[in-house]
Amino acid sequence: MKQNRKFFRRLLAVAFWLTVWQAAAMAIGQEVFLVSPVQALRTLVQLLPRADFWQRVGFSSGRILLGFVLGAVVSVVLAVCAARWSAADALLAPVMQLVKATPVASFIILALVWVRGSALSVLISFLMVLPVLYGAVRTGIASADVQLLEMAAVFRLPPGRRLRAVWLPAVLPAFRQGCSVALGICWKSGVAAEVIGLPNGSIGDALYRAKITLSTGELFAWTFVIILLSAGFEKLFLLALDKAVGAVLGEEGTKC
């Protein structure tokens, strides 16, 4: 019953904002400035059967998710090194702060000097994910139970069991939360990189073309696609992560 009530409230909230959008579109009365939600949905339906639509979705999804995976792997390795060696921590701290503080647009323009447009979204997604997950893993490592670590040392638990009994339960909740944030960031930054780099056959290229041709309906339709892809991949990844954690740690791990 509580779940149904929560779903109903969300549905009402969505309906409210769609009504506001529709009213604003009717008040403006010019689709070149603001299309109605009905027109945006109609444009999206027209895009769905086209082969180039799915090619663009595959092109952008593959590169953005590759950047996310690379960022996740490298951030875990660097966070472990920083926790293990103070020299590594001292070296990495200013780099991570610099990456976090630098505007995405600056990275994109600089990266255009180093890489081709087709690889730009991979690099930018990687850079945006890196400090988020690095910080999450560092937080998880710092939260490990000191008493459990002392017990593991006293009983001389092998590294594998120590990892499973102490480190993973401490790190995984923070890592999961970090992934939830990082996935959204990498989609936004990755598509922004495509809009500036304009690789052929990408979602960013489609957004730019819609903008210069004043196809506002197509602009909204592609934006809706990006939102769906970002939310969908986040849900699927977190579900897969929860299942993997459950398989490694047992039932308790699924609650992280």
Give, region by region, the residue ranges found by the protein language model.
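Transmembrane-helix boundary motif in ABC transporter permease subunits
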Residues: 66-96, 109
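Transmembrane alpha-helices
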Residues: 123, 127, 160-193, 221
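Non-cytoplasmic
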Residues: 178-228
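Generic hydrophobic transmembrane alpha-helix motif, especially the helices
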Residues: 97-132, 139
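Short cytoplasmic-facing helical segments at TM-TM junctions of multi-pass membrane proteins
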Residues: 136-175, 207
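Periplasmic/extracellular loop-to-transmembrane helix junction in inner-membrane transport proteins
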Residues: 27-69
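N-terminal signal-anchor transmembrane alpha helix
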Residues: 4-28
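C-terminal transmembrane helix and the adjacent membrane-cytosol boundary/short C-terminal tail
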Residues: 86, 177, 221-256
